[in-house]
Curated annotation (Swiss-Prot):
Keyword Ribonucleoprotein: yes
Gene responsible for this protein: rpmG
KW Lyase (keyword) present: no
PANTHER family registered for this protein in UniProt: 50S RIBOSOMAL PROTEIN L33, CHLOROPLASTIC, LARGE RIBOSOMAL SUBUNIT PROTEIN BL33C
Gene Ontology MF terms in the entry: structural constituent of ribosome
NCBIfam families assigned to the protein according to its UniProt record, in alphabetical order: PRK00504.1, PRK00595.1, rpmG_bact
BP GO terms, sorted: translation
Pfam family, one: Ribosomal_L33
Similarity section: Belongs to the bacterial ribosomal protein bL33 family.
Name of the featured protein: Large ribosomal subunit protein bL33
Keywords for this protein: Ribonucleoprotein, Ribosomal protein
GO cellular component: cytoplasm; ribonucleoprotein complex; ribosome
Cited InterPro entries: Ribosomal_bL33, Ribosomal_bL33_sf, Ribosomal_zn-bd
Organism placement in taxonomy: Bacteria, Bacillati, Mycoplasmatota, Mycoplasmoidales, Metamycoplasmataceae
C-alpha cells in the first residue's frame, strides 16, 4: 500500500504531537507544518519523523 503513517515532531522541544498519513508515491519529500505544541504552548514548525 502506498499510504504510509508518520508522526510530526516539534523542532523546539522534540515532542511528537501529531500522527498523520501521506501517499509516498505522490509526495516523497518530508513534511514540514506549523502546528501548535502543547509542551511549548506556542505554534512551531513540526517535521516528519518515522
Amino acid at each position: 500500500m502506498a499510504r504510509e503513517g508518520f508522526t510530526l515532531e516539534c523542532t523546539s522541544c522534540k515532542m511528537q504531537n501529531y500522527i498523520s498519513k501521506k501517499n509516498k508515491k505522490l509526495h516523497p519529500e518530508k513534511v514540514k507544518l506549523s502546528k501548535y505544541c502543547s509542551k511549548c504552548s506556542k505554534h512551531s514548525v513540526h517535521k516528519e519523523r518515522k
